[in-house]
Amino acid sequence: MKRAFNVENPDFKLSPLTGMTRQHYIEMAKYLLERAFTHIDSINDPLTFPPVPGKTYPQPDDPDWRYRSLEFEALERTFTLAGPLIHVDPEVEIKGIKLRDYYSLQLYHALTPGHPNSLPLPEDLPDSTYQFTCEFGGLFKTLLLMPETIWTHYTEEQKNEMVVTISKWAHHRTTQNNWRIFNIVTLSFLKKYGYEIDDELLKSHLLWVASYHSGNGWYLEQTYNYYSISLFIVYTT
């Protein structure tokens, strides 16, 4: 396996800085997933990456929820690559594993209460903010854009099972200005598909984010920097 992705036959007329075309991005996504899937052997294996001692989480003696967070972050971040590939080619496979089948199964396990790999619910954890909220935002950003990749392939019974976890995290407390985007995205997904949400909470998050517009397309990140409007558009499309 190549140690780095190479842009072959670049088109600098189309993309002056990188030379990358749409096909290059498709090939790069496959390359990255091929690397990621070296860490699983079958469709039943949760995706995780090797830890870097002292640098990555979880640390020794961390509670179980930290391991679920590790798995969910790997699953969501790689689905950001897999989703568009499934959208382009529903039959796409990596390492002999059909991506739609893998992500459908693993997300169902993660979001169904009671499964050994299911995420904890907010009420089962100390009252705080958690990485789960961030990953929900990323996941449902992709599913708002491309629901046909996996969401529409679940049965109504499966969806209703998963919505319990989705809704509880969508309504859970958040932090900082930009993190509200994650709640906004997840709440918006639920609302779009007819599930009950707290509309006033969604409105509150939206107004809060809008109040931090600082001009010329920049939004203040409450504690330390600014986010460009492009990020907000990407996450709220």
Outline where the language-model segments fall:
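Extreme N-terminal leader/anchor segments
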Residues: M1-T112
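Aromatic-lined, polymer-binding surfaces characteristic
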Residues: E71-F72, L81-L85, L99-T237
